[in-house]
Amino acid sequence: MDASPPTAAPNDQPANPPFIRSGHLAAPGFSEHRIYWEEYGSLAGEPVIIMHGGPGAGSHSSSARFFNPQRYRVVLFDQRGCGKSTPSASDDDATPALTDNTTQHLIDDVSALRDELNINGKMHVFGGSWGSTLALAYAIAHPATVQTLILRGVFLCRRADVDYFFQGNAAEFAADPLAMPMPGAYLDFPTAWRHFVDVIPPEDRGDVVKGLAKAFSAPPRTDAERERLVKVASACVSWEGSASRLNRDENSHGQPNQKYALTAARILVRYMINGGFLGADGAGDRDNNYILDHIARLKHIPIHVVHGRYDRVCHLYQAEALVRALRDAGNNAVNYFITTAGHSSFEPETDTRLRTIMNELPPMISPEAALLQSGEMMRHAEKPSDAVGNFGDNDVGSGLE
C-alpha cells in the first residue's frame, strides 16, 4: 500500500542517479488528468518504470537510488490525482481527481507514457506495496512489454489483505480494545491502532474501509467538516507510517502534511472500497482474486520478489501466495528473497537486496541492438537464406507488443 509519506534516504547511501528531465503527459482519452513524470540516469540505458505505492502516495526521487545511472533509464510518475499530477485529490472538491481514476486508467497511462518517452521495446517494471499490485496488473495486461518484474512488499489487494491491515478488532474495540478476532497489524502496534480507531465512529467500525469511504464521500462544506476530514485522513496515513518499519517506535511517527494526507487517504480508500478496481464485477467488487486468477499471463516473465519477514502492512503470506502461484503456473524464473525487515524499502536489508538485484540482472538487448545484431549475423552467415529464416521479423519483434 505505502500511503505513508516518503522518507529521505540515509546519509550514507549513494546519491540518486542524475536527473534528466520531467514533464506532464495529457492522459489518454477525454480526461482532465495530466500525469507528472521524471527521468533519471541515462537516456541510452535500459528503461525501468517505477510504480509508486498508496495508491495516492506519489513518486519520490529516492526511489531512483536502486539503479546504476550508467546502465538504467529510470522513469518515475505520479499516478492520477496525487503528487504533481493534476487535478489533485487534496482539493476540497476531489471529484475531478477521482473521476476516471481506476487501475485500468493507470495501466493506460503507463502505455501512453511509453509512447511519450519513445520506449519501444521491453522495460523493467519495479513496484512496492500498491506499486507491486499495479506492476502485476500492468504485466498481466501487457506481458510482451515487460522484461523483468521487481516486486517489494507484495500486495495482492484481496479483501483479506485489506482487512488484515484496516479491519483488525475495530468492530470489537469499544467493548474490548484487546480483543483478537482475526490476524492483523493491530496486534503488533496497539498504541498506533488505538489512535487510528479512535477517529472512526463506533457505528462505522464493523467495516472500517466502508466507514472511511463514508467520511470521504463529500467535499467539506464548513471549517469544522474540513477539520474532521483532515483528522481522519491524517490518522489513516499515520497508522500506515507507524507500522511500516521494523525498528520504528510506533509513537514516533509524526503527523503528515495535510495536503499529502488528504491526497493519499482519499485515493487509497477509493481504491480499497472498490477492490483496487480489479474485480470482474467492476467498481465495488471487493471480493476478487484478480492477480492470482490471471497468474498464467506472467509465466514467461522473470520475476524477483523481495518481502520483509516482519512486514505488518502487507503480510508475508501475500508474497508466499504469489510465488507459489507463479511456480505452479510454470514460471521457473522466480527469485524470492525474505529480508529481516518490515514493509519499508528503506530498511537496510531490503534496500541492499533491491540494489543487488538491479546490479545483477542480465543485460537487456534493446530492439535497436537486436536489429543490429541480427544484421551482423545475417552478413556473416554462410547461407543467407538460412540466416533470414533464423533472424526474421518474428524473432526480432518478439520483444515488442
Regions found by a protein language model. Name each.
Residues G121-A160:
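Conserved hydrolase catalytic core segment
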Residues L298-K299, V305-H307, D311:
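Short beta-strand/loop motif that positions the catalytic acidic residue
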Residues Q104-M123:
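Conserved acidic catalytic loop of the alpha/beta-hydrolase fold
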Residues A329, A333-E401:
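Catalytic active-site module of serine/aspartate enzymes centered on a nucleophile-bearing elbow/loop
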Residues A144-V209:
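A catalytic-pocket lid/entrance helix-loop region that shapes and gates access to the active site
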Residues P10-R34, L268:
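N-terminal cap/lid segment of alpha/beta-hydrolase-fold proteins
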